[in-house]
From Swiss-Prot:
Taxonomy, superkingdom: Eukaryota
Signal sequence interval, chain numbering: 1-23
Keyword set, alphabetical order: Nodulation, Signal
Designated name of the protein: Nodulin-44
Region of interest (Disordered), residue spans: 123-148, 228-249
Species: Glycine max
Any GO BP: nodulation
Induction summary: During nodulation in legume roots after Rhizobium infection.
Family membership: Belongs to the nodulin 20 family.
Keyword flag Transmembrane helix: no
């Protein structure tokens, strides 16, 4: 339970810090709507009654925990109340919902937005004659069409050396030794012209290899090795169909049986606690609900800015109200309920808000 409370406090503190940094340069028009002011005024009484069960306690640490818990209760209850009162989306339409953009004029298909410059010779993509070559297009659209003559093949290239040089082909080096092959080639049979390749060096054929004795194993396996087939099936060695004197003693292994499932044994004095699910406060769903109420309307940057300004003001005022009402001496339950409503209204709508100054 303490971990959940600590997680909620951390989440709301980080969110309020980001919101305060975002709303430093924000204008006051996001919370000066008279309709929204009436809704917040009506909701503060309900919020004060809901969160007034939190009583003050002695000690600075306990007091800070109470302040954070009360601030979270104020913010969450305020947004719940706003959502309950705005079942009709038209109530906050001037603040949240933006009108759609005007429709664009229809495009005339006869108007070419980017005409081609004149004196351009068109070519078909595959080199064939296109319709432009047959003069089947409107000359006023593309300008004057200049047909080009076909490209004729020219004479073959001829290498012309510099004056005083002779083109001599690269001669073959003499004394080429042909490599012997497994089969006898024509060079071994002396069926080539020796004057063409120069002095040929004929190598004698390799001596034939001695026959291989099948009973001799060049690399014997060490003893006490249990062979396995590559696919896990039983091979001939498992059936004892080989010569035991060649491979040594074959020791068959028993099959591996599946063991019991693993069990996590914690250290003495510790308890295995599953990782808690992340706490998502109700305030996170407020923007989604407000934006998803009217899918046919345009949602752009001003809409997000106004929503962020509104949530920032409510978040900051929740902390200010909690700090103001809980630090007063000898605060009882009835006094706390009476303190929440005027403190919340004064923070959200201070006297300078009508003149355009920021609330905090």
């Amino acid at each position: 339970m303490e971990e959940k409370i600590l997680m909620r406090v951390i989440v709301i503190t980080v969110f309020l810090f980001i919101g305060a940094a975002t709303a430093e340069d924000a204008a006051a028009e996001a919370y000066e709507s008279p309709k929204l002011k009436k809704l917040i005024t009506d909701c503060t009484g309900h919020v004060g009654e809901t969160c007034s069960t939190t009583t003050s306690s002695s000690g600075s640490e306990a007091l800070m925990q109470k302040q954070d818990g009360l601030a979270l209760c104020l913010l969450d209850s305020m947004e719940r109340c706003l959502l309950d009162h705005q079942t009709n989306v038209g109530t906050l339409g001037d603040l949240i919902i933006l009108p759609p953009f005007p429709p664009r004029p229809p495009v005339d298909p006869n108007i070419i937005p980017f005409p081609r410059p004149p004196n351009i010779v068109p070519f078909s993509p595959r080199g064939r004659r296109s319709k432009l070559d047959n003069h089947q297009t409107d000359a006023g659209t593309l300008g004057k069409v200049i047909p080009l003559p076909p490209i004729r093949p020219g004479p073959p290239l001829k290498i012309i050396p510099f004056p005083g040089t002779n083109i001599v082909p690269f001669p073959r080096p003499p004394n080429i030794v042909p490599f012997p092959r497994r089969r006898r080639s024509k060079l071994d049979n002396h069926q080539t012209d020796a004057g063409t390749l120069g002095d040929l060096i004929i190598l004698p054929p390799f001596p034939p290899r001695p026959p291989v004795d099948p009973n001799i194993i060049p690399f014997p396996r060490p003893p006490n090795i249990v062979p396995f087939s590559p696919r896990g099936r039983r091979s001939k060695l498992d059936n004892h169909q080989t010569d035991a004197g060649t491979l040594g003693r074959v020791i068959p292994l028993p099959p591996i049986r599946p063991g019991p499932p693993l069990k996590i044994i914690p250290f003495p004095g510790t308890n295995i606690v599953p990782f808690p699910k992340p706490y998502i406060p109700h305030s996170y769903n407020t923007i989604t609900n407000l934006l998803g109420a009217r899918r046919d309307q345009v949602q752009d940057l001003p809409l997000l800015i106004q929503t962020t300004q509104l949530r920032t003001v409510l978040g900051i005022c929740s902390h200010v109200t909690a700090r103001t009402c809980l630090t007063a001496p000898n605060v009882a339950t009835s006094d706390l309920e009476a303190c929440l409503t005027p403190s919340m209204n004064q923070c959200v709508y201070p006297p300078g808000a009508e003149s355009g100054s920021p609330p905090i």
